[in-house]
Amino acid sequence: TSSPLFEQPSIVVTPHLGASTREAQDKAGDTIADMVELALAGEFVPFAVNVSAGEVSETVRPYQALAEKLGGMLAGLSAGVPQESIEISYDGQIAEYDTRILTLSVLKGFFGAVGGDPVSYVNAPQLATEHGIEVRPSQSTTPKDYVNLITVRCGDHGVAGTLAGLNSVPKIVMIDDFTLDIRPAEHMVVVRNDDVPGMIGKVGAAVGEAGVNIADMVVGQNEAGVSALMVIATDEDVPDEVVAALAAKESVRSVIRVRG
């Protein structure tokens, strides 16, 4: 009780009843130090008393980063905070596990992309409540094209992703009901356009002329086949004036910057 930590108003001290030997106490201290390091880095802290996420399985853990990216992309597509709800679907084997931490990750990514105060696993649900957003998670063990799939939606927008291959590479496989396959990137532009010839060249030329390198590009089509959705990953942000110029082109319906 002589430690100066007891005098800090921001620290709540509780007894550790499970460590009855010196060796056990040392291990408990190491665990606490590891947890503090994770918290300071903004990462998920297992066993945190103020995070309602349950025990995170090794099957679910690799999907945390993907879920956060999906939340951030959804925020970009919806141009901020929606008015009603965020729907989160977990399909496949992952639905057999506790996915609460993934729901927190989606919210953390969403509100982190919206901007404002720092967002954590602790305050993300509170932010949803403050904005009047109902969070609707659902689970189905029936696979949808992939062994595991996470889909997030709000309003007219939606994004789905999975982890592919032995190295669990993150993939975005659906945006606004357009099927595609692209790795999430820090700088991305989503272009909605009529499905007519020459659009890839027009968009690529406009971005290239601005001196922005295109690292990846993919085009998705919906079932109707009358429109297409182009996703471009770039090495840096596409300038505002280029986004405006793209949006003004014939046959282009919308241009949105997102962060994956």
Feature roles, as predicted:
Residues 1-79, 95, 113-115, 259:
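Rossmann-like dinucleotide-binding domain for NAD(H)/NADP(H)
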